[in-house]
Amino acid sequence: MVNFNQFLKQAQTMQKKMQEAQEQMANTRYTGKAGGGLVEIIATGKGEVEKVSIDASLLKEEEKEMLEDLIKVAFNDAKQKCDSDSQNSMSGALSGMSLPPGFKMPF
């Protein structure tokens, strides 16, 4: 039988580790690039875009559609890096916690 007090202590430890991981993620910046660096987006761990850099060579009317695509690719690149880092951080926060039989976490 699982010791309930021990389980609660583990849950509190896990909660603290997850909060620390979330704070670290919020303070991390991710850079997404597209078009060989012609478009660059810097996003926070919360998924907020902080900066968009566009090479001057793309600022032509005939390049509008390509520029729009590159911005989308750069943003998705930054978001993928953030999501991957978030998954790794949460996995680390949960490591070592023994859960009761049949109890599954949502991630």
From Swiss-Prot:
Main localization category: cytoplasm
Positions of region (Disordered): 81-107
Subunit-structure text: Homodimer.
Protein name from the UniProt record: Nucleoid-associated protein A1I_00660
Entry-linked InterPro entries: YbaB-like_sf (IPR036894), YbaB/EbfC (IPR004401)
Taxonomic lineage from the root: Bacteria, Pseudomonadati, Pseudomonadota, Alphaproteobacteria, Rickettsiales
Functional summary from the UniProt entry: Binds to DNA and alters its conformation. May be involved in regulation of gene expression, nucleoid organization and DNA protection.
GO CC list: bacterial nucleoid; cytosol
One Pfam family it belongs to: YbaB_DNA_bd
Source taxon at top rank: Bacteria
Keywords, in A-Z order: Cytoplasm, DNA-binding
Tagged with keyword Cytoplasm: yes
SUPFAM superfamilies reported for this sequence: YbaB-like
Species in which this protein is naturally found: Rickettsia bellii (strain OSU 85-389)
Cellular compartments annotated: Cytoplasm, Nucleoid
GO MF annotations, alphabetized: DNA binding
Family, per entry: Belongs to the YbaB/EbfC family.
